[in-house]
Amino acid sequence: MHFLRRPISLRQRLILTIGAILLVFELISVFWLWHESTEQIQLFEQALRDNRNNDRHIMREIREAVASLIVPGVFMVSLTLFICYQAVRRITRPLAELQKELEARTADNLTPIAIHSATLEIEAVVSALNDLVSRLTSTLDNERLFTADVAHELRTPLAGVRLHLELLAKTHHIDVAPLVARLDQMMESVSQLLQLARAGQSFSSGNYQHVKLLEDVILPSYDELSTMLDQRQQTLLLPESAADITVQGDATLLRMLLRNLVENAHRYSPQGSNIMIKLQEDDGAVMAVEDEGPGIDESKCGELSKAFVRMDSRYGGIGLGLSIVSRITQLHHGQFFLQNRQETSGTRAWVRLKKDQYVANQI
């Protein structure tokens, strides 16, 4: 009984199934041939006993005998091929299920594949894939933890060095402004590295929440963003009478996304300019940030969303802002776009997120 419960290989299943089908239909064909041959022999014997040597009658009997063998033979071959096809399809069904499972997965879904099969090859493939996913998950988690730990540990000593420089400047009247500015840039870099590491940890378990973009993301960030823009006398304009849109995601990460978009616009826009946040609804939920800066080279949009790539080194930064935006957008299964504004100079950076279907259905 234990032997019967053991999984067998896909090759053995195919051979046994096709062999059984051919055997069954061969037996049916032999039985049919025996039955028809017996009937024809009896007819010929009857004709001989009755002295019916009519050639036309004999040829008709021969044609009937040939037809009685060919027609069932063609039918049997067609039926055999059809049943073999269905059998092979049934045996390879786990492969089709595995294909659908893999195609339906997102890049961040690293949970084990739950497909059970009594076929050795399928079990071996699923086991190998799950082992690969497990090792990949462990590697990514270790990388994120390492980045977060390093970034967190660097913030304290950098803040201490900055404090000592300020005390040194007050005590000895030394100009340490360039050093302080450089330290501020390093602290900003460390902060962005920490954000990027944390962004990759939030959705590992798939805990999505109902988030209203205006109420939960834009309005809570307004004071912080306005304070940042005041440094260059810039004005933050909120969506005008826009209806709120609900998405599935994490409000903290979406506020981080918005802050990085506004910070990028603030960095590359002239003093006294306006930076606008817009909301609109099409196939999904669109949140856009528009500025009045010089615009971008649209041929390099793909490069700008990569880590440590800057549009212009004169404006500072280390090029992680848009990489963080791209990463958070991916975690929300959305799309991130960069383009120049059509009606005037400036850049339009926007993300399209999936609307919350449950809330949409309730409406």
From Swiss-Prot:
InterPro entries per record: HAMP_dom, HATPase_C_sf, His_kinase_dom, HisK_dim/P_dom, HisK_dim/P_sf, Sig_transdc_His_kin-like_C, TCS_sensor_his_kinase
Catalyzed reaction equations: ATP + protein L-histidine = ADP + protein N-phospho-L-histidine
Keyword hit for Manganese: no
EC number: 2.7.13.3
Record-given protein name: Sensor protein BasS
Transmembrane annotation, as ranges: 14-34, 65-88
Membrane topology recorded in Swiss-Prot or TrEMBL: Multi-pass membrane protein
Induction context: The eptA-basRS operon is positively autoregulated by BasR under high iron or aluminum concentration conditions.
Source organism of the structure: Escherichia coli (strain K12)
Span of domain Histidine kinase: 149-357
Superkingdom, taxonomy of origin: Bacteria
GO biological process, one term: phosphorelay signal transduction system
